[in-house]
Every structure is written in C-alpha cells, then in structure tokens.
Amino acid sequence: MGSRPASWYEELEPPPALAEFVDRLWAQGIGDADGEGEAIYDQPVLPDGALDVVAVDDHVILAGPATRTTTVELAPGALTVGVRFRPGAAPGLVGASAADLRDLDVPLADLWGPDGAVIAERTVEATGWQARLQALVRGLIDRLGDARAPDPVGVGIAPLLADQPGRPLTAIAEDVGLSERQLRRRVEDAVGLPPRTLARILRFQRFLRAARAAGPGRHLARLAADAGYADQAHLTRESRDLTGLPPAALLTWEDNRLQR
C-alpha cells in the first residue's frame, strides 16, 4: 500500500446560488478508487449541529442533526460526497422540520418523492467525486424555486450560542423578542436540536477545531478553557457523552488515521 492514506477529505465553498442555505460541500475517499487500502475504514460521524445530504456508493440520504456519534463502515475505494447545510437553514430547502429528522438518515427518494429519486440516480451514476458533487448541487439548485427563506432566528442562534455559550436562554430570547418557549420551538424546528444541546455540540466542535489546529503537542487543559469548559474534567465528560471517547483518545485516533 506504500504511503497511500487511509482516508482523504476535501471541502469546497458552495456556489452562490446555494449560499443562503449551504455551509460547505465535502468529499471523502477511502484508499484509492481501485480498492486498495484498509479492509474496512471505521469513520466516526460526530454531532456538529448540521444536516447533510450525503451520497455514498449507491445511496443518497438526508442525514438529520445528530445528538450522538455514530460509526459508518466504509469499504476500500468508497467515495462519499456531501452538502452540509448551515445550521438552521435546511428546512427552507428540505421542506421538513429539522426536529422531525433528528438522528435519522432518510433516503432522498422517501423525502422528495420522484424528484429525490432523480437526484439520487444522477448522483450515483456520476463518475468521480467532482462529478458526483456537481450532480448533487444541480439537484438542490433545481429545488430553489420551491424553497422558502431560512428562519432568521434559527439561522442566527448557532453563532450566538457559539459566541456566548454560557448566556441564559431567557436573555437570548429577550434579545430576539421572543419568550423562552417560543425560542425553543423555533430553534428546534430550524436546527433540529434543543438550544442547550446545540450549545454543547458547538462548544465541543470549537474545541475540536482548536485541537486539530494545535496538532499532537496540544495542551488539552488550555484548549478546554479556551473553548469555554470549566476544566479538563468537564471537557472529558462532554467528550465521552457526545462521542463515547475521552478527548485524548479521539484526537489520537484522528492524528493516526485522518489526513485533513
């Protein structure tokens, strides 16, 4: 196998037509397209507060917002592409409440009927990750005529919670002119998660971004404090709850297996 990576991963900016709804496009491959590489690649999928349209092999699904880490087994040569929605923006284009999609993987044909089946067919028939992404993007652009604008409260809550993770929800609700109950309902419909669950996930993702940037010599206690955790023990509890692993073990796994 030589120096062939176990996994490669690419991210791209969305086209301007989808920028109101989509955060990024992404692709991941396992080994080489000829099937060389590890027998099975166990890919953890961590909660990130987002919904994705994902195409892997001959399946195209909408992956709802996750509250827990799951593991996907990818075969040698597997090619996965996806479109990640901005937190809170998906319902306007998807046509369903994000709360109804929580922790679910829904085939596109089940979600959008014949239109979804056509998008899925064109995507899986495309050759190469760029062509697959283009087919998926074209399918989403074709749906823009029936889309509604994202709920500004739903879209605005993620950056607000990320910047002020400890702020009382009542204060945030007052800022946007809603009762706390109304805010919870709007956020769950748009994002698919209760506000405090979303805040926990965003804080953990903030820690992960900083830890990945720091590399193997990272100082976990300092990174935990910078991300808003009370101490390293607090970070460890949250990491175990969200991923099943302590942070050091999770990051060591990434250091050893992923090329970013």
Report each predicted region and the residues it spans:
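DNA major-groove recognition helix of helix-turn-helix
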Residues: 187, 199, 238-239, 251
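Short glycine-biased active-site loop of nucleotidyltransferases that positions the nucleotide triphosphate
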Residues: 243
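Alpha-helical bundle regulatory/interaction domains
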Residues: 1-180, 190-195, 209-230, 246-260
